[in-house]
């Protein structure tokens, strides 16, 4: 059996009791570290807490070479751990399909997701979000405009946008970097983004949430990762009041 377990957003305490029990009963435990990481803990602490060895997976291990995972699931109980929820803003549906095609039973144990956390921390109503996007670190001759196109298309439809910020090995994009990259993409055009909301360390005891113009957010110390960015559309009255009270938003 292959069991997908969501670890939640921040630290060891975010996992559900069901998820913890699944780990204890597992014959093999895999941890993917490329879609999200729990910055409130370490892999060593996780191994100690769970009493299990964790097999660390990179993107290519899951998307291109999943055979060790599937073999473990054929021979016993394999648990696949991921930050957040296993099937939200991930490509893990493909792994579940592969398992099903090989006759391997599967199960999902959900975890708290950044998608619901964003709505809770910002007060932006969840049904008003459009397509999300991701901002990658640019590479030589590669600086995709897709994130900006997605944001502008959502704004035209009066929809909010969740903007995921790049996660690389020992490198985590900040709110400031994300805004600066969007501004570079808008250079020489008439496009503009009047309002941003930056969030840091969702799920922790002291998350940072700040709303305002790009100039204001560049002055905010968001602190350590993980960060995420939101571009709101026009605000409903309750949304505006929420941001005023909990994100320091000043519409003036």
Curated annotation (Swiss-Prot):
SUPFAM superfamilies on file: Tetrapyrrole methylase
Keyword Transit peptide in the entry? The reply is no
- Enzyme Commission numbers on file: 2.1.1.98
Q: Which keywords, in A-to-Z order, does the entry hold?
A: Methyltransferase, S-adenosyl-L-methionine, Transferase
Q: In which pathway does it act?
A: Protein modification; peptidyl-diphthamide biosynthesis
One GO term under biological process is: methylation
Matching entries from CDD domains are given as: DHP5_DphB
What molecular function does GO assign, one term?
diphthine synthase activity
**Signal sequence: where?**
none
> Which domain of life does this protein belong to?
Archaea
Q: What class of enzyme is it?
A: transferase
Q: Where does S-adenosyl-L-methionine bind?
A: 9, 85, 88, 113-114, 165, 202, 227
Q: Which reaction does it catalyse?
A: 2-[(3S)-amino-3-carboxypropyl]-L-histidyl-[translation elongation factor 2] + 3 S-adenosyl-L-methionine = diphthine-[translation elongation factor 2] + 3 S-adenosyl-L-homocysteine + 3 H(+)
PANTHER family, sorted: DIPHTHINE METHYL ESTER SYNTHASE (PTHR10882:SF0), DIPHTHINE SYNTHASE (PTHR10882)
Family indicated by similarity: Belongs to the diphthine synthase family.
Outline the subunit composition. Homodimer.
**NCBIfam families associated with the record:** dph5 (TIGR00522)
Q: What is this protein for, i.e. what is its function?
A: S-adenosyl-L-methionine-dependent methyltransferase that catalyzes the trimethylation of the amino group of the modified target histidine residue in translation elongation factor 2 (EF-2), to form an intermediate called diphthine. The three successive methylation reactions represent the second step of diphthamide biosynthesis.
This chain belongs to the protein called: Diphthine synthase
Q: Which species is listed as the source? A: Methanospirillum hungatei JF-1 (strain ATCC 27890 / DSM 864 / NBRC 100397 / JF-1)
